[in-house]
Curated annotation (Swiss-Prot):
PROSITE patterns (alphabetical): RBFA
Keyword flag Cytoplasm: yes
Gene Ontology cellular component terms for the protein in this record: cytosol
Gene encoding the protein: rbfA
Role of this protein: One of several proteins that assist in the late maturation steps of the functional core of the 30S ribosomal subunit. Associates with free 30S ribosomal subunits (but not with 30S subunits that are part of 70S ribosomes or polysomes). Required for efficient processing of 16S rRNA. May interact with the 5'-terminal helix region of 16S rRNA.
Family note: Belongs to the RbfA family.
Protein name per the record: Ribosome-binding factor A
MF term (GO), any: ribosomal small subunit binding
Chain coiled-coil ranges: none
Keywords in alphabetical order: Cytoplasm, Ribosome biogenesis
SUPFAM superfamilies, alphabetized: Ribosome-binding factor A, RbfA (SSF89919)
SUBUNIT field: Monomer. Binds 30S ribosomal subunits, but not 50S ribosomal subunits or 70S ribosomes.
């Protein structure tokens, strides 16, 4: 997560508690809206989408929504089309969101593909590699020897 600088300390700080709480509120509301609404965009017909995270701007007027389309056989182009479709209907979703949450301002929505699922799958694949498993076995043997001593 991108960190913001704290002008008082000169150090990096994370999002505020308010931003985190608003992001979770919007994420839950978006999940319900996407589950219940029949979106008219062609790229979004019969598609399930997971909203994994919503990051809010400090003024809570902009939200970046990280999404992962679900479904077997989706290609990179399909995913790109789905993200573009979500961005096309973002004004509609914002209107529905405004009716379902209690915030002073309903944030503008921007949808981005969440790469963390692909990264996790790649890491799992790496850990299953025989060379890596050999190294982890050696490491566990060293740790066991230290525990016995």
């Amino acid at each position: 997560m991108k960190r913001q600088s704290d002008p008082k300390k000169g150090a990096l700080t994370g999002p505020s508690q308010r931003q985190l709480r608003a992001g979770e509120l919007i994420r839950h509301a978006l999940v319900e809206i996407l589950r219940e609404e029949e979106l008219q965009d062609e790229a979004l017909q019969n598609i399930s989408v997971t909203v994994s995270e919503v990051r809010m701007s400090p003024d809570l007027k902009h939200a970046i929504c990280f999404v992962e389309p679900l479904g077997a056989g989706l290609t990179g182009q399909d995913t790109t089309d789905i993200i573009k479709g979500l961005n096309r209907v973002s004004k509609f979703l914002r209107g529905r969101l405004g009716r379902s949450i209690d915030m002073k301002f309903t944030p503008d929505l921007k949808f981005i593909h969440d790469e963390s699922f692909g990264t996790a799958a790649y890491m799992d694949k790496l850990f299953l590699d025989p060379r890596v498993q050999q190294d982890t076995r050696r490491l566990s043997d060293v740790v066991d020897d230290e525990d016995e001593a």
